[in-house]
Structure formats: structure tokens, C-alpha cells
From Swiss-Prot:
Subcellular location: Cell membrane
PROSITE patterns: DHODEHASE_1, DHODEHASE_2
GO cellular component: cytoplasm; plasma membrane
Cell membrane as UniProt keyword: yes
Pathway listed: Pyrimidine metabolism; UMP biosynthesis via de novo pathway; orotate from (S)-dihydroorotate (quinone route): step 1/1
Binding residues annotated for substrate, in chain numbering: 64, 109-113, 168, 173, 242-243
Keywords attached to this entry: Cell membrane, Flavoprotein, FMN, Membrane, Oxidoreductase, Pyrimidine biosynthesis
Organism: Bartonella bacilliformis (strain ATCC 35685 / KC583 / Herrer 020/F12,63)
Function: Catalyzes the conversion of dihydroorotate to orotate with quinone as electron acceptor.
Catalytic residues in the record: 171 (nucleophile)
GO BP terms in the entry: 'de novo' pyrimidine nucleobase biosynthetic process; 'de novo' UMP biosynthetic process
UniProt-recorded name of the protein: Dihydroorotate dehydrogenase (quinone)
Amino acid sequence: MSFFQCIGRSALFMLDPEHAHNLAILWLKSGLNSHKRIVDKRLSVRVAGLKFENFMGLAAGFDKNAEVVDAVFRLGFGFTEVGTVTPKPQAGNAKPRLFRLKEDEAIINRMGFNNDGHQIVHDRLQGRKKSDIVGVNIGANKDTLNRIGDYVAGITCFYDVADYFTVNISSPNTPGLRDLQARDNLRLLIKEISQARSENKKKHGFSIPIFLKLAPDLTEQELDDVAAELSLSDFDGLVVSNTTLFRQGLKKSAFMNEGGGLSGRPLFERSTIVLAKMRQKLGKDIAIIGVGGVWDAQTALEKIKAGADLVQFYSGMVYEGPDLAKNITKDVLQMMQQDGVDTIKAYRDHHVEKWAKFELHL
């Protein structure tokens, strides 16, 4: 057991979850984390035209405001995703809005896209030396009169500093946002964002990959609709998945009925089923980032086997500590050695059929 698991977690878990998160950001800002990322060509992957030093990324939600981008890479991540960022700064939903379900090793959040807004986050990213891969997760303000316009504004604002974009239309904490996943709305959203990318490509001289982040709470027909629209688009990939509104199978917890999206261990199965189904529906070429319930090398590799090219996590780090990316890296390399595998990509799609056969119970 690590120092964090023995001492650090107990101390942090005595604090309000949001306060503990803010302390983690301050710790990373301090520069006290001196880890070096393990560099091994077997972990390197090329996805959507980008070369990732390793396949593990920090999911959006941790570094919302791009305050600790470079420090995150010292934790062992191959890429990071900042945000969700909206055009105007917003405070988010009323507190308390973040809850630990310790019995389930899960988190419920209803943060509501609290962030510093486009301009401040852009300026922070512009002030760093661009080397490691940083994605920007874009969203819409709660009070906006033009949701799609907010996403277009995000593409334009961050085009010169982002390595890729994630279009977040799947947060359950902004009323009506998930309606953008409906087929007609999605078609219009994709059209407008693609046009924005085309215009910015002409202006800047290069193209930025765009990913769409999905909810895990869609029906089979809704997944078919998303797949159909993506197949007709020039989007580069999917992020599967966001948090879930479902609470089935949770242990007794004082917070299990709190409103908001559930992440952590209980999300692994559902998010992996959706991942595999989307891989089946979209074929082998489109890029997919697998998120949800990644806790160790086994769950990280299972995402790859279910069809992911890259993997992200955040909640796992809350429970397992800041060494999680480094530990997963070491364990994955050991497993690759045992399996006689030379590249992480060799595992992709091995278990797609296994996961895709499960029904999505709503």
C-alpha cells in the first residue's frame, strides 16, 4: 500500500471533497511532485494524427481551468484534457455539489461547468510551451441563448492552443444539454462545428482533431443515431463515456441518491459496453477514448480490448492516489512482457464482441 493509501487518503477524505480537490491543485502548482513519466515506445500510439507518448490521459474535470497542465504530465500521463470550458466564466451549481461514495469507490458530481471562461483559460494555455498533448473540452453556458454558438466559439477561441477538442454534450448537470445528442440536434451541431474548424483551418493552416463525448445512458437506437451522424461527418472520434444518472447496484451510502453524474468503479461496466457497441457500429478507423471506472492496469487494458485507442481516468486517482498513472504504466508493461506484445495497440478490439453483446438496461 502506498503512502497515499495509508495516510494521505484518510487525511484528504476528512475534508469536503471540493476542498480536497482544490488542495490537490495547489499541491501540483507547488511543484513538489517530482515524478518523471515512464517513456517506453511500446506504450506510444498515434491517434487522429497525433502521437501520444502513452495511451493514458487525465480526464476532463480535474484541471478545469488549465492551472496545472505541465504538472499533470509529471504524474505519468501521456495527455491531459482541460475543461469543461464555457465562453463566459460561471460559478456552477450551488454547493454541496461533489460527493464521495466510499463504499462503492465512486463519486457523484453536479458541478455545473464551473470554470474561468474561454479567455482566461486560453491565456493560461498560450503561456506554456506546447509540447505534450493537451485537449480542450468545450461546453455551453447554462444561461446561453445559443448552445451551438457556444461550441463554435470554443473552437475558434482555442484553435491556436489545443491539440484536440472534445465537444461535451453529455454532462447531466446542465439542464437540456444532453438533448444535443438527439439526431436532428446532433446533425446541426456537427455541421456548425465542422464549419468552424474549416474556417479556422484556413486561417491557421492546420486542422485540429475533434471528439464527441457521449453519455452512457443512451438507448441502442440512440447509439445507432449517433453512429449514423458521425459516419457522415468529418469528426475524428468519440470519448466514451461521461458520467451516468443510473444508481443500480450501489451499496448503501448516505449520498447515493444525490443528484448528478456518477463516476468511479460502478461506471466501468456500462461505459465499457457502450464503448464496444460504438466500436462495432463505427468500424475500426474512427478514434475512441475510453473513460469510466479505470482503476488499474487490468481495467485500462480492458478498455483497449473493448475498442478504445486511448484511455482516460480521474475518479480512480481520487481513491488510488497520484501514483496511479505511473503504477498502471509499470503493470501494463509487465503484462505486455508476459503476453509477448510489442505495442499497446495490439490489444485493441480483442473483447469487442464480448462487451457489445450485453443489453443496455435503462
